[in-house]
Amino acid sequence: MSEAQWVRIDNGKGYSVPVTWVSGGGPVFLVMGALGVAAPFYDKLVAELAAQGWSVALMEQRGLGSSALRPSRRHNWSFRDVVEDDVPAVLDWIAREATRQPVYLFGHSLGGHYAAMCAGLYPQRFEGIVMCACGSPWITAYQEADRRRVQRLTRLIPLCHLLFGYYPGDRLGFGGREARGVMSDWRHLALTNRYRLGADDRRVDQSLADYTGPALMLRMENDPFASAIAVDSVLRRFQRHRPEEQVLSAGELNDKADHFRWARRPAAVVARLARWLEEEGVGRRTLDVER
């Protein structure tokens, strides 16, 4: 495994995206994390992916960890900024750094939603997507106590934005300190189960319905945030080609099969990924990396 490099990638809109890069052969995995989770949480996943000889680009989220931004009344961003500006900039950088290597988007939770949105908007830019522990926060996908918690959050989020100018998830126990635009889009998803970029909540889902590229959903058996119903609420968007869904148990993970524990011991996740890649045939499609 080559030594990790830390780079900042200019997105052309006044922001530099922090990325941890490990160069290897074979496919490249662009890893995107969960809501409120900084990049170092995925260090073991990066090491496990790199141990396969693969290249890895771990993208830090805006407002977390090594990001120069922090959400406030003055500093705000949304799903659209990440999906239309940050991810394409990182893909451009990967195309220059790892010429002709197939690229896969690997997203955990919110990162999985970002991967799905990218699949709807510019599927020609990468080979396929992997969504891990990625369920929709759609209220209808939850029952009883869990549903009430999501409903309370949808009411609390606008109030927080008025009071603080951002969402203080680090104090509320859900997510981190998040930009109001991100949480407004998350709230819209919880209320409608539709991805929203700016004022448009139709374009992405309409495009994603036609996606036919390789796609894998890894679901944890006892994940309250990404239950079978919540995961199905994501997968139903893919109307022409439903992603393959695989379920990992506590026995396979050698730890609790929940929303976060898999990342502590990611060997089972990476083993599933390796088998899926072998079945799919890595790099079988021609990538339009030059746009």
Question: Where is each model-derived feature located?
Answer:
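N-terminal cap/lid segment of alpha/beta-hydrolase-fold proteins
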Residues: 1-21
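Active-site glycine-rich loops that stabilize anionic/oxyanionic intermediates
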Residues: 26, 34-37
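Alpha/beta-hydrolase active-site loop
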Residues: 76-95
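Alpha/beta-hydrolase-fold enzymes
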Residues: 106-194
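Short beta-strand/loop motif that positions the catalytic acidic residue
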Residues: 211, 217-219
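Short alpha-helix in the alpha/beta-hydrolase fold that links the catalytic acid
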Residues: 213, 227-237
